[in-house]
Structures are given as structure tokens and as C-alpha cells.
Amino acid sequence: LIGCSLNDGKDLIIPGYTRILRQPLNTNTGYLILSTIETFNYNAEVVERFLSTIGYNGLFSLEFIRDKKGKDYFLEINLRNDGNAYCVQTAGVNLPLIWFKYAILGEVPEFKESINKPVFFIPDFIDMKSGIKKEGLFGWIYQFVTAKSHSLFNLRDMGPFIYELKRHIR
């Protein structure tokens, strides 16, 4: 779950959840899909109770594993902006801006509460080796091109991607 907690944990914005589709060996940020929270069956009351009990305000992500029988096992909660959270912004919900306006200006801006459709996120170079191994070169290129959200690749600002590309070529 990726979200933002306001009003000491009493008001939660959780527009979606991510599911890792391919996990690289060297990180927990893999090729994933962000889906709308309305399609996810989870115990929202436990999440709400935890964040309101600790009185937390801010960005967060909550991670758990679901077994084959549907039982959830808590892994961790990150009380910070998650590395995968950019896909939520790509989907149209800018959680860091909501948090900024709440924390600095004392207001909750109007915002889109949920995402309309799933967004695929690819961590570009981190995923390349495992992605090509699993999908083949053309399969991975297809996933790269069709992913709506990337960790580095952005047509409006190619600098970080080109820098990292040069680093990998050397």
C-alpha cells in the first residue's frame, strides 16, 4: 500500500497498491503494477488503527506478503516516501504535494482520490538483467516501452537516464 496519513492518522489517502511482477536479486524495487485500491481486499481497519494510534502524519508505504490461502503477513511500514511511490504520481495522485500542502500550508488541497487504471512501473537498469533473462530481449523492451512509469526514463528530462546509460555502457 502506498499512501499519505493526515490529521494524526485519522485521515488516510491510499489510492492504490503495488504488486511486484518481477523481483531483481539486488533490490526490493522490481517491475510492478500499481492497481486501484478499490480492487484490493485487505484489512483497512488495521492500517487505520495503527496509523491513528501512533498519530502519524506523512507519506508511507506498508508491505506484506499474502499466502496462497489469502492470509496476510506484515513485513514493514515505511514512514517516508517510498521509492515506488512515483508510479502513484504517474497515475494522477500527487501524494508528496498533498503532504507538502498539509504540512506547510495547513490545508488539504483538492485531489484525485484514486487511480483510474493500472500503471506498470519499471526500475529501468535495475530490472534490465533479470527482465531480459526472464522475458527475452524483445519481451523486456516491450515491457520497458509500454510501462507508463519509470525510475529514470522520462522524455521530458533525459539527463538522469542518459547519465546512467553511459555508466552501464562503460
Regions found by a protein language model. Give the residues of each.
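ATP-dependent carboxylate/phosphate-activation module, predominantly the ATP-grasp catalytic core
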Residues: 2-55, 78-103
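Broad, structure-driven detector of short, well-ordered beta-strand segments within folded domains
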Residues: 2-6, 62, 118-122
